[in-house]
Amino acid sequence: MTNNLRPGERLDDLQLGGLEFIQNPSKFCFGVDAVFLSDFAKVKPGETVLDMGTGNGIIPVLLAGKTKGKHFTGLEIQAETAEMARRSVAHNHLEDRISIVTGDIKEAAERFKPAFFDVITTNPPYMLADHGLRNPDDSKAIARHEVLCTLDDILRESMRLLQDKGRFYMIHRPFRLTEILTKMHEYKIEPKRIQFIHPYIDKEPTMVLVEGMRGAKPRVTIEPPIIMYAKDGTLLQKNGNNSEKQR
């Protein structure tokens, strides 16, 4: 059914148990980083999850399709984007498992109960507010640059909202990894697992996945890297296994 679509929107098949997703190409569409994050995050049966800066809600929808988590909450500051996310949730009849909340990450701990969530996920803006060229479209600038929230905001609120030994999952850019790990330790979210994502086996990583645990002891594992493409352009799965040819 497409009666939930607005002008300029499309309905995409997620290839995941019949789930479909509403997007607007002129605004912002989710990328492969969201898929990698949803694969990396470990959600156990019965757990509660908060996705900070959920955008159009892709992470909660993917996690609802991939895991047996009890409930997923997406927090999004842009009202129009949050409304689109709610329509995707309703389209897939996931209202009993996913809630989309319009609100500011910087005030997340005031909106939710302290130490309430088992898991927090985030695909935050990668660029500092003054780094590089901002996209003239505000919605894309907010998604890509730290215009409305910073790494400190995300980690501070996550520290307050995670249960003891609760898990934190984030995808980011490798050039900020030193800052990320330092700040995670400062906010008592100890880095536990790191995985780099390379476009090709002989190229530097372009993304990094990080798992942290609230109140844990220092000990980190480096996972085997994800290689996205073979040299001939063949699309690969995790750790270099062959997948279908890129089209």
Predicted regions mapped to residue ranges:
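A generic structural signal for alpha->beta connector loops
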Residues: G18, G46, G69, E95-R97, ...
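SAM/dcSAM-binding transferase cores
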Residues: E204-R247
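Mobile active-site "lid"/loop adjacent to the S-adenosyl-L-methionine
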Residues: P124-D153
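Conserved SAM/SAH cofactor-binding pocket of Class I
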Residues: F40-L133, R156
